[in-house]
Amino acid sequence: MPPAVTRETLGAWLLKANPAVWDVRRFRAEGHTRLTSWSVQRGYRTGLMRPGDRVVFWLSGPGTGDLVRGVWGLGHVVGEAEAWQDTDPGWWLDDAARQALRARVDVDVPLLDHPLPAADLRSAGITDLEVQRVPQMSNPSWVSRAQLDLLADLLPAWPDPPRAR
């Protein structure tokens, strides 16, 4: 079976957060407005991640209250995925999930002022994103170039990639 994603088909990486596992409310309440790294599952996909690749940050879960399921951030990969063990509880609500991590990737993903709800994607006819079809899949998920083109009308302007240091 060929890989689901290749460098040629990739539009953006999609990184998911489950609010039952990672405390997005507290993260925001503490004044954070951007993600600088995210946990990923080691595998062929993390081997494909490159600095400059686009990133969509997706909040999963039931989508109730102010934690609407959908797109919460847009940005870029800024470093290669690397082996990693998270020893800081940080915003984790599920310690077993935190301890199960084995890799992370550095990103620059500003959070959106107004998340784009998954329901708005469905209303626009966007129903075949991997995160919609297989929501329990581990990070990273992905969005094809064609799917990203369809999303463009619903999303705010993509931020510029950060400058190299």
Where are these regions (language model features)?
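Eukaryotic short linear interaction motifs
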Residues: 22-23, 64, 83-85
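Aromatic- and Lys/Arg-enriched surface recognition patch
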Residues: 68-70, 76-142
